[in-house]
Amino acid sequence: MKFSVNQKDLQESLSFCQNVIERRSTLPILSNVLLEASGKELIITATDLDMIFVHRIQSVEIEKEGKTTTNSLIMYDIVRKFISGKKINVESLSENKMQLESEKSKFKLNCIDPQEFPLMEEGFEAEEISLDSQSFLKLLNKCKFSISNDETRHYLSGIFLHFTSGDDKNFLTAVSTCLLYTSPSPR
């Protein structure tokens, strides 16, 4: 794998990954991001087994396709210290080493075999939903009071998002042991 990418694009993607990855995991692969250079895009994936984050960077120059995983936090710390807006060259040196290079700086990072990275296959690319972020945030803020904080009842600590096609009967629901909140969606 060998590609060049803009520093800002890579930093933005890796900063989103920091909210998903596990820092103190018993599985080292969960602290890593999957980097996949294929076609005309770089696909960056992070997961903690409960949620998955996938970001595609289109403005990338790929010399050699491939994929690898490396520690997300270490890579993010390196990338954010590179000069903003400059090109970063990324290359797999071997199965367990990769190199980041920008201007006069070179860093070698340890990698883990990408086959070990846990990907949730079923229904992953099923459907895309677009919502106005401000309206969605308002709905989440209205709904969060009724989410249970009881760790013994983890099945009550989430929000159910229901979207139907065509009839505009979309809603969010949150429930705790004594509260129920249902709201129409901002579609």
Where are the language model's segments positioned?
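Structural preference for solvent-exposed beta-strand-turn elements
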Residues: M1-S183
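Positively charged, low-complexity/disordered segments
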Residues: S185-R187
